[in-house]
Amino acid sequence: MIKQRTLKRIVQTTGVGLHTGKKVTLTLRPASANTGVIYRRTDLNPPVDFPADAKSVRDTMLCTCLVNEHDVRISTVEHLNAALAGLGIDNIVVEVNAPEIPIMDGSAAPFIYLLMDAGIEELNSAKKFVRIKQPVRVEDGDKWAELSPHNGFSLDFTIDFNHPAIDASTQRYRMDFSAEAFARQISRARTFGFMRDIEALQSRGLALGGSFDCAIVVDDYRVLNEDGLRFEDEFVRHKMLDAIGDLYMCGNNIIGAFTAYKSGHALNNKLLQAVLAKQEAWEWATFEDEATLPVTFRAPNLVLA
């Protein structure tokens, strides 16, 4: 039986909140089978839980947040959620003593290292996948995103940024998903923003944690970060990272092919909700033995250099 995964032990780190610019303590806790992914704000009394759920997602200008029925929110969940998807963590409690997950370096890599440091524990319950049975597509103007049947999880993402720093040949990225592929090819890709937007937000008391340490920053002509890019196509790789995190908001890995053109958090979430709302478009899948499991989802065997 392919089993659900959680952590072996509690791990903790600190970082800076993108919105507040203040120090945030992040604690990752193991959870029992069928708990799912739970985000928890411990700065509130009593603490407030936010189960990962496609319907709770709100897309703001700066990040993805989860909002409960009382309009309480937890922000900047997308990069950690992508790391959970990357390692196939089914059950976890994510605690922060703030309204937001720390931004770290703007990628998912610090979270991958933290999760690997905790270690992965298999639980004695079958891991449940969402298997796509029919194509589902959503559109917004010229932007679109689609999930279609595929025995694995493949991603094909195209961006269309007219900017001197983003070469036309680096605007499409394709990948057959695996924990190793995610860790090596996607997790290190950072979020990006315009200097003018960051300055405008900070003048209004927003994005106070935004800096060269946690994003690729561009002006109208070039990348301003001293060390440049981590990949020549880091921009599109980060959009794929975002999509992996967005699609994991249902708390289950997807078996299917994801294709997108100029999609973002809002459209990715719209696609996930459209799939889940169309009962004939998907089914639950479990696997009795590894031989029948798509190679994509074999247990991660990561040695991170």
From Swiss-Prot:
GO molecular function: metal ion binding; UDP-3-O-acyl-N-acetylglucosamine deacetylase activity
Active site annotation, chain numbering: H265 (proton donor)
Signal sequence bounds: none
GO CC aspect terms: membrane
BP GO terms, sorted: lipid A biosynthetic process
Record keywords: Hydrolase, Lipid A biosynthesis, Lipid biosynthesis, Lipid metabolism, Metal-binding, Zinc
Functional summary from the UniProt entry: Catalyzes the hydrolysis of UDP-3-O-myristoyl-N-acetylglucosamine to form UDP-3-O-myristoylglucosamine and acetate, the committed step in lipid A biosynthesis.
Listed PANTHER family: UDP-3-O-ACYL-N-ACETYLGLUCOSAMINE DEACETYLASE 1, MITOCHONDRIAL-RELATED
Homology family: Belongs to the LpxC family.
Name the record gives this protein: UDP-3-O-acyl-N-acetylglucosamine deacetylase
Organism this protein belongs to: Erwinia tasmaniensis (strain DSM 17950 / CFBP 7177 / CIP 109463 / NCPPB 4357 / Et1/99)
Lineage, highest ranks first: Bacteria, Pseudomonadati, Pseudomonadota, Gammaproteobacteria, Enterobacterales
